[in-house]
Amino acid sequence: MIVSPHKASRIPGNRLRKALMASAALVGLMSAGQLWAFNLDDVAAKAKDLAGQKYEAPKSNLPAVFRDMKFADYQKIRFLQEKAEWAKDKTPFKLSFYHQGMHFDTPVKINEVTATTVEEIKYDPSRFEFGDVPHDPETTKNLGYAGFRVLYPINKADKQDEIMTLLGASYFRVVGKGHVYGLSARGLAIDTALPSGEEFPRFTEFWVEKPKPADKHLVIYALLDSPRSTGAYKLILRPGNDTVVDVQSRVFLRDHVSRLGIAPLTSMYLFGPNQPSKVMNYRPALHDSEGLSIHAGNGEWLWRPLNNPKHLSVSNFSVENPRGFGLMQRHRDFKDYEDLDDNYQKRPSAWIEPKGDWGKGTVDLVEIPTADETNDNIVAFWSPETLPEPGKPFEYDYRMHWTIDESRFQAQELGSVTQTMRSTGDVKQSNLIRQPDGSVAFLVDFAGPALAALPEDAAVRSQISVGDNAEVVENNLRYNPETKGWRLTLRMKIKEANKATEMRAALVRDVPVEAAKPAEEAKHDKTAAKHGKAEKAAKAEQSANAEQPAADAASTNGTPATTEKVLTETWSYQLPADE
């Protein structure tokens, strides 16, 4: 009921004044809370301010005893879990910290954000057990934390496990339920694989929101800094079978860059079936990731098996508005790796899902030679065609999926590449002995529900393209009853071994063109029907149309018109130089 002001009861003056004062106080408190609440804008303001200043390289405060230690000694410095941040609070997430040591010689500032405060989490040496590492307690007084870990009961309700680690430059790693650490992500990559040298931006300060008891996510803010860039990042961590990280970024350039890497991923590939080990090894494969997957804006899916080349290799895949890309580990059986210690079958894939349109650019793949598995030698990122101008902010938001269920990030309506195998090419002689003929052979298995639904005698064929540096001597496609898919065998002779060779393949089949649907019968015009003229005209038109072939109907010789249907993702491979 609306009460007329003229009929409303009058409130005594003192009561009115008290009510107004209480309301004003409440509004003030609410406004203060809303104005104070820490968010990405606060970090972006710091980043913008930094971008207008000359870059100051971080200074190491590390005593020689920690700076010169070996990795085995660094591992002896153990964080005491009972002293984790929020250990005594009923929060689902806890934080533990990395001590400075080796090349982690510069501290990062870590802050706790609550509803009313932002306070630095100060370094405390009593949180660590140093074992037999010789050190003077006085030398640790002015140190800081090198980074931190996020703990969460992801596998067992009564056990806090690491689900995220942030240590070094702008690197971070994430796992889901049942995973072990594998590949890494970074905040930003600059001039990767260029002769001028790569610049590694660094997270210098973090703000972590203290979670409430019922929270299923953790919010982390980060400030990024480097000679030519600054940035503000918001990471929302959501643990689960697949752990998801939502990333918001606002970046400023101090100076021009030649190549910008957005959503960069870093991994390791030593050897596998498409590039067997040169040294005898009981493991069939050794890698954190085995291929780059790309879902282009036009709907195409591409699969690029990784290499450990003898020379630096950079591949660029032109994509407009990518729907997703990632470094993937598709093989998930223990027998694929046979490694009881490192469990490569449990190492996650990372899939980048852009939010919004990213425009024109390339997904870049960098492959670096490595002699062992301790070096990350694979990098993948999105590189925009138009580079931002210094001083002008740019934003890229995306979702990262850390998963061991790669089928969720493949085209359900297409077959996928399940393995790529390389072999010495040979020809079977009349005596049934196989004789090498100087060629190299690739066997590519395509499988999946879409292919399994086809009869084994379906007229499936391969569609291939090979660069000028190779001559194809065999292109053979066979049904594989073991996988209910098809196996493609490509054998080719390489013209110049010191050059890389590109090749692509997909499976297709011809399908009938759908006949054009007959036009809907015209409704009788009432006036024309009344006079009988419209009906007569319609009959004459129908008779004429019956004598004309439909646009896509059978040709004059009775053969149905067909169109080519793509059945699989595109297999794209580069045979490295000097292989």
From Swiss-Prot:
Q: Which GO terms describe its biological process?
A: beta-glucan biosynthetic process
Q: Which UniProt keywords apply?
A: Periplasm, Signal
Q: Which residues form the signal peptide?
A: 1-37
**Subcellular location per the Swiss-Prot or TrEMBL entry:** Periplasm
Per its UniProt record, what Pfam families does this chain match? MdoG
Q: In the UniProt record, does the keyword Signal occur?
A: yes
Do the record's keywords include Signal? yes
Disulphide bonds in the chain: none
Example GO CC term: the record gives: outer membrane-bounded periplasmic space
Question: Molecular function (GO) terms listed?
Answer: carbohydrate binding; catalytic activity
- Listed Basic and acidic residues bias regions: 517-539
- Pathway where it operates: Glycan metabolism; osmoregulated periplasmic glucan (OPG) biosynthesis
Superkingdom of origin:
Bacteria
Renumbered to this chain, region (Disordered) spans: 516-579
Q: Check the record and name the InterPro entries matching this protein.
A: Gal_mutarotase_sf_dom (IPR011013), GH-type_carb-bd (IPR014718), Glucan_biosyn_MdoG/MdoD (IPR014438), Glucan_biosyn_MdoG_C (IPR007444), Ig-like_fold (IPR013783), Ig_E-set (IPR014756), MdoG_OpgG (IPR023704)
Stored PANTHER family: GLUCANS BIOSYNTHESIS PROTEIN (PTHR30504), GLUCANS BIOSYNTHESIS PROTEIN G (PTHR30504:SF4)
What is the role of this chain?
Answer: Involved in the biosynthesis of osmoregulated periplasmic glucans (OPGs).
Hey, which family's this protein in? Belongs to the OpgD/OpgG family.
**UniProt protein name:** Glucans biosynthesis protein G
